Design a protein with these regions (language model features):
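Short-chain dehydrogenase/reductase
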Residues: 34-35, 88-91, 95
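Short C-terminal tail/terminal secondary-structure segment
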Residues: 14-16, 92, 103-116
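Short, small/polar-rich loop/turn modules that mediate ligand/substrate recognition or access, typified
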Residues: 42, 47, 102-104
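Catalytic loop of short-chain dehydrogenase/reductase
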Residues: 1-29, 34-43, 55
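Conserved SDR Rossmann-fold cofactor-binding beta-strand/turn motif
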Residues: 47-57, 95, 108-110
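A conserved structural motif in NAD(P)-dependent oxidoreductases
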Residues: 76-87, 98
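A glycine/serine/threonine-rich, flexible loop-to-helix segment
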Residues: 9-16, 43, 53-76, 86, ...
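Conserved internal alpha-helix within the Rossmann fold of NAD(P)-dependent oxidoreductases
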Residues: 4, 30-31, 80, 84, ...
Length: 116
């Protein structure tokens, strides 16, 4: 492989929930663009995958906005927000030799948010 491209949509490209429809449509467009680019760039040995992060708020949010922090921790089925190393693991996988036959996917890292 010569390279890897990773657009960054979000979980709202897979599910609407409470965000405005234009936000979800834009994120869904990135996911579709990932698939399209993967098909057309694969012959050139370029992989294209996306990662859709769920809630990964900064830890300082817990002190500044405790009500929002509590809400974000209740939304995912895992009942907690993500931590940076968990998102980094997905990025490292897609950038590593372990995923040289993976292209055109959208990998949600969201604690199960988009599973329901």
């Amino acid at each position: 492989m010569y390279g890897m491209v990773s657009p960054d949509p979000s979980i709202y490209g897979n599910s609407g929930h409470d965000n405005p429809p234009y936000y979800g449509a834009a994120k869904a467009g990135l996911i579709q663009l990932t698939r399209y680019a993967a098909v057309h760039l694969a012959p050139h040995k370029v992989r294209v995958n996306a990662i859709s992060p769920g809630p990964f708020p900064p830890p300082a949010l817990a002190e500044r906005m405790p009500d929002l922090w509590a809400l974000l921790n209740q939304k995912p089925p895992m009942r907690r927000v993500g931590h940076a190393p968990e998102l980094q693991g997905a990025v490292l996988f897609l950038a590593s030799d372990a995923s040289t036959y993976v292209t055109g996917i959208n990998l949600p890292v969201d604690g199960g948010w988009t599973a329901w």
